[in-house]
Amino acid sequence: MDTIHAYYTAAAEVLSPLYESGEAREIARRLLEDALGYSRSQLLVADKDTLLPPHCRERLSQQLQALGSGRPLQYVLGYAPFLQHSLFVAPGVLIPRPETEELVELVLEEAARAGYRSFVDIGTGSGCIAYALAAGLPELEGAYTLELSEEALQVAARNFDALRATTGRSVQLYRDDLFRLVESTEGALPRGLDLIVSNPPYIHPEEAAAMSPQVLEHEPHLALFAPETSPIAYYLALARLVQQGYLRPGGSLWVELNPRYAEETLEDMRRIVGPEACTAELLRDLSGKLRFVHLHYSPQP
């Protein structure tokens, strides 16, 4: 595997048992671009008989071995794209998904119209939602996140350090459990925020049989799976945050959810906040599935 062509061919073959042929070739291309520091167009026009530098060959060989064992590409590279950003990721955090990009785009659209300036991201994981919101809100006044996992906190902190270095904008991290927070009267998290945003664990454990080994064996189950006996428990707790004043009147709660429980989630969240105190709707993702709840908090004076 001394040349670009030889590595590309060999990598696609090694990955073919785990991925469809097109995806295997795409991964091989991504590895080469990362190792060589090339853009896609630079790799396309490069002489395919170009010898790979020794340090690149060693790195590519190690990465291919990791991928062959089923480790996700984003963990192997150490980063994942999210909208126009590139975020550090590691095995302790969920790999950002396209649906979550859609969620953030919806939030940013509303925030621009409403002039929202503060938010909290509950269960921040890698920090992808908070990072994109903090970078994208025109006039940011307060950015906060809540996370329980120590591994995730370390990853998010690294991403927020990078955000501060490039934009001067800061995100505050709080280590706490959502369920403990809603039962506490002394939480450190500020109240009266413009936005509450969350992509909590929402996969029912019985759905695991249909999931890929790459996800099940490598991504954190804490971030994937909802409680078996109460699969919408996180959403009920999020609704209680609204009820407890963490969201100001005129603010919005946005969540990503499991289409399987979409209607139930919407109705129970509306019930907890109070039907007369909010308007709530389900929105579909680009694949047509019910994927998001938007709850606008408008209590009567």
PLM feature segments, named:
Residues L31, G70, T100, I129, ...:
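Residue-level signal for inorganic ion chemistry
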Residues S298-P301:
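Flexible, glycine-/basic-rich loop-and-beta segments that form/coincide
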Residues L15, A111, F160, R164, ...:
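Conserved hydrophobic residues forming the short capping helix/wall of the S-adenosyl-L-methionine
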Residues E33-E110:
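Conserved AdoMet
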